[in-house]
Amino acid sequence: LPGKRVFSAATSARMRQLMRMIVVDGTGRKADALGYRVGGKTGSAEKPGVGGYSRNLVVATFAAAFPMDNPRYVVLTMLDEPKGTEASSFQRTAGYTAAPVVQKTITRIGPLLGIIPDMKRDVDVSELMPLLWKAKGE
């Protein structure tokens, strides 16, 4: 839809690269729906309780857009007090809980939206990879 541009084309392209990088090699890896070029952002927050924040209760959120070379759709998943499983090493953060929900959602709704998975195309994030922090040994 035509409208007033809020960000420059360069800023928009860089944000799409950054969001794709989060899914390719960051905290959102479990959201990657092959061929759909998903980009996104994880968010995990401790819930407030009496006298401060609860270390045991969290809200996990993953906001995704796809396909990132020409975003058309957004999927937002928010899980209130997710439980970690053995498969997630009992982690409750968004990368382990909300991101897989996004991956399954996009894989199922993509074809209904007329989006054909394309394994040959992707968003080039190679210039950003040196910026990605990695723990020693990874």
Predicted regions mapped to residue ranges:
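Active-site beta-strand/loop architecture of penicillin-binding DD-peptidases
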Residues: 1-2, 10, 16-114
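Acidic, Ser/Thr-rich low-complexity intrinsically disordered segments
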Residues: 6, 14-17, 21, 124-138
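Acidic/histidine-enriched alpha-helical segments
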Residues: 31, 35, 114-132
